[in-house]
């Protein structure tokens, strides 16, 4: 059975990775990394900045989101029950225009032709952070889930997928580990994990 973790190399170009790192280093908006409960150095040790909300990242964020969208559509095409399963979606048949319930059985015929629009309509991107972990000291050494209630909007409860990019190569350490899948992903510049 699939572990549902896709590792896609070279999604971000070396130039884009370098630009993101340089912009990060110059940003006046760097903050101590936070968990759902705020700053907790026992759980997360990083320096973060929102690249989706800070104007100094606007041009780079647009490029990252274009590339992210392309990969998310491919991911949902591969694991289409992430789209079909959560809600009983009714869509227009691409040939007849008649309303039809989208199912796993008719996904190829009914869902796939309009997949890009369905993904854009049903999923939303939350706040996107760039994070720096210091070798030998940084990290998120706490097994955690990305789903937790947090007032006032409970944004994390809307999360369906996690995606991340690595902006640099790390020779030793720095892996992102997935507990139940017994999988560790090594950082490599341009690599995306969904």
What residues fall within each predicted segment?
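Fe(II)/2-oxoglutarate oxygenase catalytic core
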Residues: 1-192
């Amino acid at each position: 059975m699939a572990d549902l973790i896709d590792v896609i190399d070279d999604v971000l170009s070396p130039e884009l990775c370098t630009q993101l790192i340089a912009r990060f280093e110059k940003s006046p908006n760097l903050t101590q990394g936070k968990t759902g409960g705020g700053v907790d150095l026992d759980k997360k040790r990083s320096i973060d900045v929102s690249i989706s909300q800070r104007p100094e990242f606007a041009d780079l964020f647009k490029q990252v989101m274009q590339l992210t969208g392309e990969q998310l559509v491919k991911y949902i095409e591969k694991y289409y029950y992430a789209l079909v399963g959560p809600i009983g979606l009714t869509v227009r048949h691409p040939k007849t225009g008649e309303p039809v319930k989208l199912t796993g059985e008719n996904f190829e015929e009914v869902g796939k032709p309009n997949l890009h629009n369905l993904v854009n309509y049903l999923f939303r991107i939350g706040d996107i952070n760039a994070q720096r972990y210091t070798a030998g000291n940084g990290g998120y050494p706490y097994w955690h889930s990305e789903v937790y209630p947090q007032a006032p909007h409970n944004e994390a409860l809307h999360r369906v997928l996690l995606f991340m990019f690595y902006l640099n190569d790390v020779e030793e350490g720095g892996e992102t580990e997935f507990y139940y899948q017994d999988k560790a992903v090594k950082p490599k510049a341009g690599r995306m994990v969904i």
